[in-house]
């Protein structure tokens, strides 16, 4: 990346995972914002948070990741943010549904260490930036 701090909104209903990923992304020059679930993330976006990346779980109470993506799209919240799923759901139908809702990447939690997640997010972001320059 270009040394500039990227803003990331991490959305999960597991406080331990939120803290762990917040630390890892902070150590890698990200400005980190967290939300405990889809509802809180939508509230933050409506309040004016404009992250470069939204990293979200799919399995959450109240509003799951799919509902969150639908709301982000319908209400045109943070339309330029790169949306990435980080979930234990690994069925092809879930990946296709998320892709159809506009995610740029899909990371399976169980097969990725926290630092691998950071590296994959950076890779997805860099690929998106390169594609926009073409």
Question: PLM ranges: what are they?
Answer:
Residues 60:
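Receiver (REC) domain active-site loop signature in two-component systems and cognate sites
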Residues 49-55:
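Active-site beta3 strand of CheY-like receiver
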Residues 1-7, 114-134:
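Non-catalytic signal-transmission and effector/linker regions of two-component phosphorelay proteins
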Residues 19-27:
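Charged docking surfaces used in two-component/phosphorelay signaling
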Residues 43, 66-79:
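Short amphipathic alpha-helix used as the core "switch/output" element in two-component signaling
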Residues 34-43, 65:
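Helix N-cap/capping motif at the beta->alpha junctions
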Residues 57, 87:
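Active-site residues of response regulator receiver
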């Amino acid at each position: 990346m270009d040394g500039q701090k990227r803003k990331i909104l991490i959305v999960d209903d597991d406080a331990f995972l939120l803290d762990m990923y917040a630390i890892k992304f902070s150590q890698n020059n990200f400005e980190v914002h967290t939300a405990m679930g889809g509802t809180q993330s939508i509230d933050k976006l409506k309040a004016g948070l404009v992250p470069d990346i939204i990293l979200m779980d799919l399995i959450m109470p109240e509003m799951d990741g799919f509902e969150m993506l639908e709301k982000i799209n319908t209400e045109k919240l943070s339309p330029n943010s790169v949306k990435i799923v980080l979930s234990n759901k690994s069925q092809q139908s879930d990946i296709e549904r998320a892709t159809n809702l506009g995610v740029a990447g899909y990371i399976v939690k169980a097969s990725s260490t926290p630092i691998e997640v950071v590296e994959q997010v950076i890779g997805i972001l860099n690929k998106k930036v390169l594609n926009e320059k073409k």
